[in-house]
């Protein structure tokens, strides 16, 4: 009998807050990265990726590190540079966008975006999620983003805050290459 394992909580990795996505013929899992014996959540300083073929979802493969907190410009040596639960979306340009919350004792608390040409390659910092006036959106506790590509409109929703709509955030010449803009929403979170 073949042994299968759970990529969310295997014996040597702790990947809570999992966000599974199907890209091509594989399912990819993105999530936070807890430290064994840690004293708080998200203590590891990076994100790692996992994937499995759609026709054999028990065959999970560890893809390695896909992003490090040291790549974020708000990173501070010696501070708690926590990378909270991320999510990934494929833009209409074919690239993959990693939305993540970055916080901790570094004093930084906002959502950021990194970009990559493959789902689990090496993501590169792209920018902050911004308000319509261009200021960095950090009014609320930033965490647990969920992103979808809704027929070309990148929609961003997050826990602990008001929902966002990242319309045309990833198109060339959109006027801002550093994340997305907050849409005005009513109390139910709809635009």
Question: Can you name each region flagged by the protein language model?
Answer:
Residues 1-191:
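Carbohydrate-active catalytic/glycan-binding domains of CAZyme proteins
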């Amino acid at each position: 009998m073949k042994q299968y394992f759970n990529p969310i909580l295997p014996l040597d990795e702790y990947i809570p807050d999992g966000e599974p996505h199907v890209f091509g013929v594989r399912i990819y899992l993105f999530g936070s990265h807890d430290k064994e014996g840690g004293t708080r959540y998200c203590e590891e300083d990076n994100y790692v990726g996992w994937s499995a073929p759609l026709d054999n979802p028990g065959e999970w493969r560890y893809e390695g590190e896909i992003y490090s907190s040291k790549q974020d410009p708000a990173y501070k040596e010696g501070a708690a540079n926590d990378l909270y639960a991320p999510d990934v979306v494929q833009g209409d340009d074919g690239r993959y966008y990693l939305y993540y919350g970055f916080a901790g004792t570094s004093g930084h608390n906002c959502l950021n975006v990194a970009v990559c040409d493959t789902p689990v390659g090496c993501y590169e910092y792209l920018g902050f999620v911004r308000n319509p006036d261009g200021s960095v959106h950090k009014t609320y506790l930033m965490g647990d983003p969920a992103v979808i590509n809704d027929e070309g409109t990148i929609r961003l929703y997050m826990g602990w805050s008001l929902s966002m709509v990242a319309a045309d955030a990833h198109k060339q010449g959109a006027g801002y290459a550093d994340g997305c803009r907050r849409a005005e929403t009513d109390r139910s979170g709809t635009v």
